[in-house]
């Protein structure tokens, strides 16, 4: 039956006939002629309305003929019987069901209305060739029915394409959002690391902080001492070596004596124990305020007051005056000069001979012996020889400066030959010991000045405390 329906459709296209008014009659014997065919059909179709036989064809599969019949307008195809008897057997009638076309057209119109499209838009979308103008309305409906199948296939493809495009866009957006979140998390983690670990730049910056030069004044007033710089041991020793090579040795300058120095000096002679107690209290106060000190600086200060066979001059008034100057500067409660100079104030205030010792510490030994020996040893020096008698009246008290005597003492080598071996060796040994003590004390003073001049009062009190025992 399907083959007969396809044959009817193809035949109507070839004959340009309306498929809705065409009939296909099959089962006609091969030897049946045109008159006999019309006579048989006349008995069946004439009551329904006019008809005409358009053409005949032979079917090999059925080994029979088939006739294409067109009925007139107004004939109801449903009233035509599907089978009727004829010559050679049963003849069958095949036609298009009108209800099938009506339902299809109805569905097509509803679809176009929902999409807000027309049949022309469908043709343009599918790029179909414009068909020839139909002769009747039924003819155009048939053409559009064929185009609908193509349209539905295209619509399905478009829907699939749009769905895939939307899915790809959503996936791309999800990936972009994930990347943005990852970048934000990395940035926040990096910011936290920077806040927690400032790095080596902050440590190096703290090591470059300058020390406050007025910090020792704050210590004298009762404040906290200056904090030590945070540096490596290797870098500190290297910088100190460079300073020792580049900076020349600074000579001590005596402090200016205040008007009330005599009274304070006398007070210091009368009450040495009270001054020692005050100096010890200040020493403990300074040590408490200077907890963060460098070990190297502490060792340098410990080496400064080296105990040796040092003999102070016999003129006690000058020594007492120097003690008075030191105690007076402590009682005033302030530092008039740098801490380095204050540590040596007890010597430089009234004893230029000691200053001369320090200046010519690298000079000849005889010069140091002349200025540092006690007056009780003068008889030993007078035994030098015939030239010693000339030097005796020229010698002055240890407190008087004798800068012009150094050349004569150095140039009296030939005259000093008659000196006895005992006194020469003893004087030479004493000179070496005094020179070593002076050199050690000068090295301690230089290290103390370069390390920041810390704890000058401790050195002063210790040196002053050693005077009675040394004398």
Swiss-Prot record:
Q: Bias regions of kind Basic residues — which residues?
A: 238-247
Basic and acidic residues bias (residue ranges): 270-287
Segments carrying the region annotation (Disordered) are 188-300, 321-471
**InterPro entries from the UniProt entry:** PNM8A_C, PNMA, PNMA_N
List all Low complexity biased stretches: 256-269
| TM stretches of this protein | none
A Pfam family annotated for this chain is PNM8A
Entry similarity comment: Belongs to the PNMA family.
Protein name as annotated: Paraneoplastic antigen-like protein 8A
């Amino acid at each position: 039956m399907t083959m007969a329906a396809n044959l009817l459709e193809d035949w109507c296209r070839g004959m340009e006939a309306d498929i809705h008014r065409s009939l296909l009659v099959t089962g006609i014997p091969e030897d049946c002629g045109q008159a006999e065919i019309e006579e048989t059909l006349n008995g069946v179709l004439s009551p329904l309305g006019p008809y005409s036989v358009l053409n005949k064809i032979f079917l090999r599969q059925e080994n029979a003929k088939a006739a294409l019949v067109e009925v007139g307008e107004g004939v109801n195809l449903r009233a035509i019987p599907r089978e009727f008897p004829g010559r050679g057997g049963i003849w069958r009638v095949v036609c298009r069901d009108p209800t099938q076309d009506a339902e299809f057209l109805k569905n097509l119109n509803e679809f176009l209305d929902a999409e807000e499209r027309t049949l022309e838009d469908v043709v343009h979308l599918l790029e179909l060739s414009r068909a020839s103008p139909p002769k009747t309305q039924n003819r155009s409906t048939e053409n559009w029915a064929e185009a609908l199948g193509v349209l539905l296939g295209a619509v399905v493809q478009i829907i699939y394409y749009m769905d895939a495009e939307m899915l790809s866009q959503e996936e791309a957006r999800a990936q972009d959002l994930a990347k943005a979140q990852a970048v934000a998390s990395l940035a926040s983690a990096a910011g936290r690391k920077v806040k927690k670990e400032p790095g080596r730049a902050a440590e190096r910056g703290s090591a470059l902080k300058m020390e406050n030069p007025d910090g020792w004044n704050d210590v004298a007033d009762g404040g906290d001492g200056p904090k030590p710089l945070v540096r490596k041991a290797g870098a500190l020793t290297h910088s100190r070596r460079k300073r020792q090579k580049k900076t020349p040795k600074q000579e001590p300058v005596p402090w200016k004596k205040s008007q009330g120095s005599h009274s304070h000096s006398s007070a210091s002679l009368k009450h040495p124990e009270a001054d020692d107690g005050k100096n010890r209290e200040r020493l403990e106060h300074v040590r408490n305020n200077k907890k963060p000190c460098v070990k190297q600086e502490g060792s340098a200060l410990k080496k400064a007051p080296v105990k040796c066979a040092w003999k102070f001059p016999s003129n006690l008034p000058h020594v007492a005056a120097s003690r008075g100057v030191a105690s007076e500067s402590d009682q005033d409660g302030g530092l008039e000069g740098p801490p380095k100079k204050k540590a040596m104030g007890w010597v430089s205030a009234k004893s230029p001979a000691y200053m001369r010792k320090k200046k010519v510490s690298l000079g000849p030994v005889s010069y140091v012996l002349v200025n540092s020996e006690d007056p009780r040893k003068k008889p030993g020096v007078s035994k030098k020889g015939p030239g010693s008698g000339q030097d005796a009246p020229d010698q002055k008290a240890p407190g008087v400066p004798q800068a012009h005597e150094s050349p004569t003492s150095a140039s009296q080598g030939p005259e000093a030959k008659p000196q006895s071996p005992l006194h020469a060796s003893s004087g030479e040994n004493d000179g070496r010991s005094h020179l070593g003590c002076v050199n050690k004390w000068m090295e301690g003073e230089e290290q103390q000045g370069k390390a920041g001049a810390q704890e000058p009062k401790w050195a002063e009190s210790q040196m002053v405390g050693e005077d009675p025992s040394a004398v």
